[in-house]
From Swiss-Prot:
Keywords: Cell membrane, Endonuclease, Hydrolase, Membrane, Nuclease, RNA-binding, Transmembrane, Transmembrane helix. This is Ribonuclease Y. Endoribonuclease that initiates mRNA decay. It comes from the Bacteria. It comes from Lawsonia intracellularis (strain PHE/MN1-00). InterPro entries: HD/PDEase_dom, HD_domain, HDIG_dom, KH_dom, KH_dom_type_1, KH_dom_type_1_sf, Ribonuclease_Y, RNase_Y_N. HAMAP family: RNase_Y.
């Protein structure tokens, strides 16, 4: 039983092993076959893909070669065209050069021909010159034999005869031309001047050395005088103007040769009357304000004068100085009005003569600018004015017209300067325009003030009481009481030496020392 079982078991094992081996071989063959087929297929596909890529690469290479070939052919054609164009240009230039060479050769041939002709003519001329020279020598010898004079003597005689004849003729012609020119110039000048005078119609008021201020009541006179006269003394000291309070009802007369001082005094007095507070400290404050306001008015007056005449571009400082002329007089004639009149006359006459009208008006307006500062600077007003104009960038033509209008630095050399001189004479020579007596009086007062101002330590000097008194303000820090007395004597002595005058002149030297303290 067990043997059979064992036998069956062994048989089963053999049968199972054989079956397994058979099945294994069969399956292995199948797998191997599949793998071979797969490998063959992969190889085939790889071969096909490689061929496709090869074709694609070949195609791309062919395309690139084709494109490069096209580009090369295009570039070649372009360069061929450019070379063709350049070749044509070179041909044209070559043809032109050939033409030029031909023309140059022709000209050279012509020049050679002309040179030959000239050389022939030169030889002929030399021959003729020699013939003429020999003939002239023969004739000179014959003339010397006939006249008994040498060549030099004959030349000198002929020259003297021609010179005398020419001189006589030219002198005769010059006399005729000069007479004609003088007659024409005089007639034309009279026409131009008459024209200008008729066209100008400026108003004129004679200037005086006094100004009247109307008071609201008679009581105001006492307030102006103040206790023991301190207010009126403060007014006269601050303004340099003589305040005359007399029996004239409700009127105070201000007397001073300087119109600017009178104007400051008038403005200050009117403001004090309106304000009501009249005492020395207030007087000084108001006078300072009035001086500042007058400086503004002076500039405005100068600007208005330039606007009225139509002159622009003048330096602001010259405009300010021009405004000061409104407060200066020359033989009672207001200098600013005189300058405006001269500018107008200059412009009118310049238009007749064809001279620059704007320059003529400018020179006429500025011709007396030096009179605004001639009391501060030594010298003639014409020379001072020329220096001012030059300082503030006026042209040489304007400067010359200013300095030459009184011929102090030579005669006028330009038409503009002559116009200014003529217009100045016309404006000043009108009947009633100027009064000699008042001008000499004003100059005497100016001289008095200048004498006092020459001394060291003098701050201000005023000539008042019609020149019968000089009030001198000195600096308290630089001059003591004893020196004040000596200064007074020195000024009086200098006036006696320098001036001739009737009666006597009182010299008052004022030294004021102030001490100011504040209670806190």
């Amino acid at each position: 039983m067990s043997f059979i079982l064992v036998l069956c078991t062994v048989s089963s094992l053999f049968v199972g092993g054989g079956t397994g081996i058979f099945l294994y071989k069969k399956v292995s063959k199948k797998y191997i076959g599949d793998a071979k087929e797969l490998a063959i297929r992969i190889v085939e596909e790889a071969r096909k893909e490689g061929q496709a890529q090869k074709k694609e690469i070949l195609l791309q290479g062919q395309n690139e070669i084709f494109n490069q070939k096209k580009e090369f052919e295009f570039d070649f054609k372009q360069r061929e065209k450019e070379l063709s164009i350049k070749d044509k240009k070179l041909q044209v230039q070559s043809e032109r050069l050939e033409e030029r060479l031909e023309r140059a050769a022709e000209k050279e041939h012509e020049i050679l021909k002309v040179e030959k002709e000239l050389s022939i003519k030169e030889r002929n001329l030399l021959t003729l010159e020699e013939q003429l020279k020999s003939r002239i020598d023969e004739q000179e010898k014959q003339l010397q034999k006939i006249s008994g004079l040498t060549v030099e003597e004959a030349k000198q005689s002929l020259f003297e005869e021609v010179k005398n004849r020419s001189r006589h003729e030219s002198a005769k012609m010059m006399r005729l031309i000069e007479a004609e020119a003088v007659e024409t110039a005089n007639r034309k000048a009279k026409e131009i001047i008459a024209n200008a005078i008729q066209r100008y119609a400026g108003d004129y008021v004679s200037e005086h050395t006094v100004t009247a201020v109307t008071l609201p009541s008679e009581d105001m006179k006492g307030r102006i005088i103040g206790r023991e006269g301190r207010n009126i003394r403060a007014l006269e000291s601050a303004t340099g103007v003589d305040f005359i309070i007399d029996d004239t009802p409700e009127t105070v007369v201000l007397s001073a040769y300087s119109p600017m001082r009178r104007q400051v005094a008038k403005m200050a007095l009117e403001r004090l009357i309106q304000d009501g507070r009249i005492h020395p400290a207030r007087i000084e404050e108001i006078v300072r304000k009035c001086e500042e306001d007058l400086a503004i008015q002076v500039r405005e007056i100068g600007e208005q004068a330039t606007f009225d005449i139509g002159v622009y571009g003048i330096h602001p400082e010259l405009i300010r100085i021009l405004g000061q002329l409104n407060y200066r007089t020359s033989y009672t004639q207001n200098v600013l009005r005189h300058s405006i009149e001269v500018a107008s006359l200059c412009g009118m006459m310049a238009a007749e003569l064809g001279v620059d009208i704007k320059k003529a008006k400018r020179a006429g307006l500025l011709h007396d600018i030096g009179k605004a500062v001639d009391h501060e600077v030594e010298g003639s007003h014409a020379i001072i004015g020329a220096e001012l104009a030059k300082k503030f960038n006026e042209t040489e033509e304007i400067v010359h017209a200013i300095e030459a209008h009184h011929e102090e630095k030579g005669k006028p050399e330009t038409a503009l300067a002559i116009l200014v001189q003529a217009s100045d004479c016309l404006s000043g020579a009108r009947p009633g325009a100027r009064l000699e007596l008042l001008e000499s009086y004003v100059k005497r007062l100016e001289h008095l003030e200048n004498i006092a101002g020459e001394f060291e330590g003098v701050s201000k000097a005023y000539a008042i009481q019609a020149g019968r008194e000089v009030r001198v303000m000195v600096d308290a820090d630089s001059i003591g009481d004893d020196q004040t007395y000596l200064l007074c004597k020195d000024i009086a002595g200098r006036i006696e030496e320098s001036l001739t005058y009737p009666g006597q002149i009182r010299v008052t030297v004022i030294r004021e020392h102030r001490a100011v303290g504040y209670a806190k």
